[in-house]
Amino acid sequence: MAGDSNVHDHELSGLPPELAERIREEAAENDEIYRRRSADTLDLSRVHYFHSEMVDWAIKQMGNLKGARILDVGIGDGLTSVLMALAGAQVTGIEVSSVALARAETLAQRYNVGLNLQEMPGEDLRFEKDTFDGILCLSAYHHMDQKRAAFEFGRVLRRGGRLVMIDPFASNPPAWLYRRIGQIFSREATSRETPLRVRDLRFLREHFDKVDWRGMYFLSVGLIGLERIWKNPHPSIFRFTESAFKWTSPFDSLVLRVPGLQRVAWKIAVVAQR
């Protein structure tokens, strides 16, 4: 069940003070983001075309979900948790935002699936060693203390289990510009997020036997920026970007085959095997 308030002080008391404060800030800022979202968006048929493609790819990397014990880290509205539960997984979803958890609970109820929802940061997982068969973490790792989160992921994931992550890449030029002028756009972001670089994967390699990564998307970031110039884009703009994405996404896949360009992709997708 979702909690009624932000991450509680007593739950963060064992963490370094600076990390505890960072988590509190993330919780408060994410609460504000999710309060602005309409309840009408809690609908699997209304998922944004870009997010839908990204989620589909990530869930496929998780393998057979039937009966699998899955930890979904930073679940937001609960989209991925509900989709994996519908596929037969036993899903535990964690979030630092109580507002997001309440939305995720509503989504789960709408689709009649059971989720174990807990208010918890990825840097302090209150689970026993080897609890989970898989971990999914979409657009959340870059909000965390990466070294500590990597340790926690490796600890609670069983031997042979898989971690799948997608996060923004720090070195994509259009995305870098987009982040710098994000206040002009209706960009949902928190103040302490840190997009990943390839060298950041060293923390995962300390706890996982194999860590593979690939770049995802290149020019497509421009379509998202175009949409978000306005908080409520005209339907014709959305139709244009959705149609254009059908072309830019496969084009991006071709472009990113060129040696060296993987490092300037918009997103970095990681599959780590323990």
Please place each PLM-identified region on the residue numbering.
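A C-terminal cap/extension of S-adenosyl-L-methionine-dependent methyltransferases
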Residues: 218-274
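Class I SAM-dependent methyltransferase SAM/SAH-binding core
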Residues: 71, 77-124
